[in-house]
Amino acid sequence: LVGSEMCIRDSPDKNSFCYSGIFKTICTEISAKKEELEIIDLYRDPFTRPREKVIKKYKELVTWCDRIYIVSPVWWFRLTPRMEIFFDEVFEPGFAYKFVNITKTYAYPVPFLKSKKVRTYVTHGAPALPVLTLYVNSVKLRLVMGVYTFVFGWRLSLFTKTKQFWSVPFVSHKKRTEYLTTVKNDIRKDLGLSL
C-alpha cells in the first residue's frame, strides 16, 4: 500500500539547513520507500496576487495527501510570512474548519482535516533556553494551539511531532548531523520502517 505524502518547504535559501538538510532528508527517505510525494515550495511557486490558482492547487494537495510534512525557519517568533499566508488562505474556514456556536458570542472550531497526519520541523537561530522559558515556548504553542488544533483537531501528537532545532546557524556539524538523524528516524517511523 503506497501512502501519499506532501512536504511544504518554506525557505527562500537553497543552502539553508531547512532546505538542504531537513527537506532533502525527508525526500530521500520517502523516495526510498517509493511513496507518492508532492512538494509545495512556498518560495518558488507563483505566490504574488492574484494567487487563486496556486491556493486551489494547494487545497487539492492537502485533500489528496495522507501525511503533511512542514519545514520552516522561525523568523521573529513565527514561521515565515509565506507560511502564515498559506495558513490564512489554504486552511481557511469552510475548507479546513468551521465555527459552531455554543452561545451567541462563543463558538468553537470543528476541524475538517482530522484524518491528516502532520509532522513539523522548525529551525531557530536562537538557543532553546530563552525561547522555552522567557518566551514560554510561544512559537510551538501558537503553531499547535493557534493553527493545528483548528484544522487537524486536538491530539497530543501535534505537540510531539512538532520538533524545534535550536541555534542552527551556530551549532557544530556534529549537532546538525544529530538533528538530521532525528528527522531520518522520524520519517522511517512514519513510513513503518525499522530504524
Annotate each language-model stretch with its function.
Residues 34-47, 161-166:
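A short beta-strand-loop structural module common to alpha/beta enzyme folds
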Residues 130-195:
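Glycine-rich phosphate/pyrophosphate-binding loop and the adjoining helix
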Residues 21, 25-35:
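A short, Lys/Arg-enriched amphipathic alpha-helix followed by its capping loop at the start of a domain
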Residues 51-63, 179-186:
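Glycine-rich, highly charged phosphate/nucleotide-binding loops
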Residues 17-22, 139-143:
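Conserved alpha-helical elements of sugar-nucleotide-dependent glycosyltransferases
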Residues 1-7:
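Short, small-residue-biased leader/transition segments that mark boundaries at the very start
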